[in-house]
Protein backbone atom coordinates (compact mmCIF):
# COMPACT_ATOMS: atom_id res chain seq x y z
CA UNK A 1 0.00 0.00 0.00
CA UNK A 2 1.19 3.50 -0.82
CA UNK A 3 0.22 5.06 2.52
CA UNK A 4 0.39 3.08 5.75
CA UNK A 5 -2.10 3.79 8.56
CA UNK A 6 -1.74 1.56 11.61
CA UNK A 7 -2.79 3.98 14.33
CA UNK A 8 -4.42 7.33 15.00
CA UNK A 9 -0.91 8.81 15.14
CA UNK A 10 -0.28 7.68 11.56
CA UNK A 11 -3.54 9.31 10.50
CA UNK A 12 -2.69 12.60 12.24
CA UNK A 13 0.80 12.51 10.72
CA UNK A 14 -0.79 12.51 7.26
CA UNK A 15 -1.88 16.12 7.84
CA UNK A 16 1.64 17.03 6.68
CA UNK A 17 1.09 15.15 3.42
CA UNK A 18 -2.09 17.14 2.83
CA UNK A 19 -0.20 20.35 3.62
CA UNK A 20 2.35 19.52 0.92
CA UNK A 21 -0.44 18.77 -1.55
CA UNK A 22 -2.06 22.10 -0.65
CA UNK A 23 1.16 23.93 -1.56
CA UNK A 24 1.11 22.37 -5.02
CA UNK A 25 -2.60 22.71 -5.82
CA UNK A 26 -2.88 26.35 -4.76
CA UNK A 27 -0.29 27.23 -7.42
CA UNK A 28 0.88 29.98 -5.05
CA UNK A 29 4.51 30.27 -6.08
CA UNK A 30 5.54 31.76 -2.73
CA UNK A 31 4.05 28.79 -0.87
CA UNK A 32 5.72 26.36 -3.26
CA UNK A 33 9.08 28.10 -2.83
CA UNK A 34 8.60 28.06 0.95
CA UNK A 35 7.73 24.36 0.90
CA UNK A 36 10.83 23.56 -1.15
CA UNK A 37 12.96 25.74 1.14
CA UNK A 38 11.56 23.95 4.23
CA UNK A 39 12.30 20.54 2.69
CA UNK A 40 15.80 21.63 1.69
CA UNK A 41 16.68 23.06 5.12
CA UNK A 42 15.09 20.14 6.93
CA UNK A 43 17.16 17.64 4.93
CA UNK A 44 20.36 19.66 5.32
CA UNK A 45 19.87 19.79 9.11
CA UNK A 46 19.22 16.03 9.23
CA UNK A 47 22.40 15.30 7.27
CA UNK A 48 24.51 17.70 9.33
CA UNK A 49 23.25 16.43 12.69
CA UNK A 50 23.67 12.72 11.88
CA UNK A 51 25.81 11.20 14.63
CA UNK A 52 25.72 14.27 16.86
CA UNK A 53 24.66 14.17 20.51
CA UNK A 54 22.14 11.27 20.44
CA UNK A 55 19.74 12.43 23.19
CA UNK A 56 18.88 15.46 21.06
CA UNK A 57 19.51 14.56 17.44
CA UNK A 58 19.00 10.78 17.07
CA UNK A 59 15.52 9.41 16.56
CA UNK A 60 14.08 7.48 19.51
CA UNK A 61 15.02 3.80 19.70
CA UNK A 62 12.65 1.67 17.67
CA UNK A 63 11.52 4.49 15.34
CA UNK A 64 9.87 2.86 12.33
CA UNK A 65 7.85 3.99 9.34
CA UNK A 66 8.50 7.68 9.91
CA UNK A 67 8.56 9.12 6.39
CA UNK A 68 5.82 11.25 4.81
CA UNK A 69 3.75 8.17 3.92
CA UNK A 70 4.29 6.36 7.26
CA UNK A 71 6.55 3.80 5.59
CA UNK A 72 10.31 3.29 5.41
CA UNK A 73 11.01 0.63 8.03
CA UNK A 74 13.38 0.89 10.97
CA UNK A 75 15.24 4.23 11.03
CA UNK A 76 16.13 4.66 14.70
CA UNK A 77 19.82 5.04 13.78
CA UNK A 78 19.19 8.22 11.73
CA UNK A 79 18.88 11.85 12.76
CA UNK A 80 15.37 13.10 13.46
CA UNK A 81 16.33 16.74 13.89
CA UNK A 82 14.18 18.64 12.99
CA UNK A 83 10.81 16.97 12.43
CA UNK A 84 9.87 17.38 8.77
CA UNK A 85 6.18 16.76 9.44
CA UNK A 86 6.05 19.54 12.01
CA UNK A 87 8.14 21.81 9.77
CA UNK A 88 5.70 21.54 6.87
CA UNK A 89 2.52 21.98 8.91
CA UNK A 90 4.07 24.84 10.89
CA UNK A 91 5.09 26.55 7.65
CA UNK A 92 1.59 26.14 6.18
CA UNK A 93 -0.32 27.30 9.24
CA UNK A 94 1.88 30.33 9.87
CA UNK A 95 1.82 31.25 6.17
CA UNK A 96 -1.97 31.23 6.28
CA UNK A 97 -2.07 33.15 9.56
CA UNK A 98 0.30 35.82 8.28
CA UNK A 99 -1.65 36.00 5.01
CA UNK A 100 -4.96 36.80 6.71
CA UNK A 101 -3.20 39.37 8.85
CA UNK A 102 -5.60 39.06 11.80
CA UNK A 103 -3.03 37.96 14.35
CA UNK A 104 -4.70 37.85 17.74
CA UNK A 105 -4.62 35.36 20.60
CA UNK A 106 -7.62 33.38 19.33
CA UNK A 107 -6.20 32.94 15.83
CA UNK A 108 -2.76 32.02 17.14
CA UNK A 109 -4.37 29.26 19.23
CA UNK A 110 -6.57 28.07 16.34
CA UNK A 111 -3.74 28.00 13.81
CA UNK A 112 -1.48 26.15 16.25
CA UNK A 113 -3.95 23.30 16.87
CA UNK A 114 -2.95 21.30 13.74
CA UNK A 115 0.72 21.93 14.51
CA UNK A 116 0.35 20.65 18.06
CA UNK A 117 -1.64 17.61 16.87
CA UNK A 118 1.09 16.64 14.41
CA UNK A 119 3.84 17.29 16.97
CA UNK A 120 2.03 15.14 19.55
CA UNK A 121 1.45 12.37 17.00
CA UNK A 122 5.12 12.34 15.97
CA UNK A 123 6.23 11.99 19.59
CA UNK A 124 3.62 9.34 20.40
CA UNK A 125 4.43 7.38 17.23
CA UNK A 126 8.02 7.24 18.47
CA UNK A 127 9.54 9.05 15.49
CA UNK A 128 10.76 12.17 17.32
CA UNK A 129 11.46 13.62 20.73
CA UNK A 130 10.24 16.96 22.06
CA UNK A 131 13.34 18.90 21.00
CA UNK A 132 13.04 17.63 17.42
CA UNK A 133 9.40 18.68 17.06
CA UNK A 134 10.10 22.09 18.62
CA UNK A 135 12.96 22.54 16.13
CA UNK A 136 10.57 21.63 13.29
CA UNK A 137 8.03 24.13 14.61
CA UNK A 138 10.63 26.90 14.72
CA UNK A 139 11.98 26.07 11.27
CA UNK A 140 8.53 26.15 9.67
CA UNK A 141 7.64 29.37 11.46
CA UNK A 142 10.94 31.01 10.49
CA UNK A 143 10.55 30.21 6.80
CA UNK A 144 6.92 31.42 6.81
CA UNK A 145 7.89 34.65 8.55
CA UNK A 146 10.85 35.34 6.24
CA UNK A 147 8.75 34.73 3.13
CA UNK A 148 6.01 36.95 4.53
CA UNK A 149 8.51 39.77 5.04
CA UNK A 150 10.05 39.36 1.57
CA UNK A 151 6.90 38.31 -0.31
CA UNK A 152 6.81 41.42 -2.49
CA UNK A 153 10.46 41.02 -3.48
CA UNK A 154 9.93 37.34 -4.28
CA UNK A 155 6.89 38.14 -6.45
CA UNK A 156 8.81 40.89 -8.29
CA UNK A 157 11.65 38.47 -9.06
CA UNK A 158 9.20 35.83 -10.25
CA UNK A 159 7.53 38.38 -12.55
CA UNK A 160 10.97 39.35 -13.92
CA UNK A 161 11.74 35.69 -14.62
CA UNK A 162 8.36 35.21 -16.35
CA UNK A 163 8.95 38.30 -18.49
CA UNK A 164 12.46 37.15 -19.40
CA UNK A 165 11.24 33.69 -20.39
CA UNK A 166 8.30 35.02 -22.43
CA UNK A 167 10.65 37.46 -24.24
CA UNK A 168 13.02 34.60 -25.11
CA UNK A 169 10.18 32.41 -26.37
CA UNK A 170 8.60 35.14 -28.54
Question: What are these regions, as identified by a protein language model?
Answer:
Residues 142-170:
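C-terminal membrane module of polytopic membrane proteins
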Residues 1-81, 86-122:
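Hydrophobic alpha-helical bundle signature of multipass membrane enzymes
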Residues 51-60, 117-148:
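Interfacial helix-loop-helix junctions of multi-pass membrane proteins
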Amino acid sequence: MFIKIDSIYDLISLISLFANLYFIFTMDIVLIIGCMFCILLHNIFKEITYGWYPPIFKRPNGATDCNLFNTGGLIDHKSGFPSGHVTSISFLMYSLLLKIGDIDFKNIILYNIPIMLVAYARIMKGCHNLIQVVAGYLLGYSVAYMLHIYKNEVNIKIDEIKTYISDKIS
